[in-house]
Amino acid sequence: KSTLVNLIPRFSDVKNGSVKVFGHDVRDCKFGYLRHVIHVVPQKSNLFSGTIKDNLLMGDRSADDRDIDFALKVSQSAEFVSKLKDGTNTLIEEKSKNLSGGQKQRLCIARAIMGHPRILIFDDSSSALDFATDAALRKALKENLNDTTVFLVSQRVNTVKNADKILVLDDGELVATGTHKELYKTNEVYRDICLSQLSEKEVASV
């Protein structure tokens, strides 16, 4: 899954065929352009030395406090950051020891939201979030990033089930595409995943 989405920002290139962004082969696009319009939240949450604000501004050096507040709100970071003594001026300790895994992940998401990218890729990057926070994040993304195409790489059915289109990969191969309801009814691989993760009530509502 990661290999597939890494082709979009051109972290690696296809050997056959092409990957197009807004009608253009990514190999014909300048790297600076791709980095500007495509932001990626990787699996591993990496924050850097400095304050929370310093880290967020890495996503958009020209951002103001309003942009920061927006990114914190959408990423579900606003509440815990507001409770910190120094707020966004809180220094991040070595290896981010003063933050939990979920907090680090949310701040990485906030940084990716900065600059309002046209494409936002989540590479299995909500794994440290509890289900309630994950659901709130997906709701906020849908409500606030109307002009952004969002790719969600996840092993959680609940994370992807409301997506406009789901791609099912099995042993590295694309085996089906469709909506949650379509795939549950027509694809055995997807249905088995659903049955292993969803409650009887959730399955019955499909």
Where do the protein language model's features map onto the residues?
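Conserved catalytic loops of ABC-family nucleotide-binding domains
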Residues: 143-152, 160
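A short, proline-enriched helix->beta-strand linker immediately N-terminal to the Walker B motif
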Residues: 114-118, 147
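ABC nucleotide-binding domain "signature motif"
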Residues: 15-25, 165-166, 174
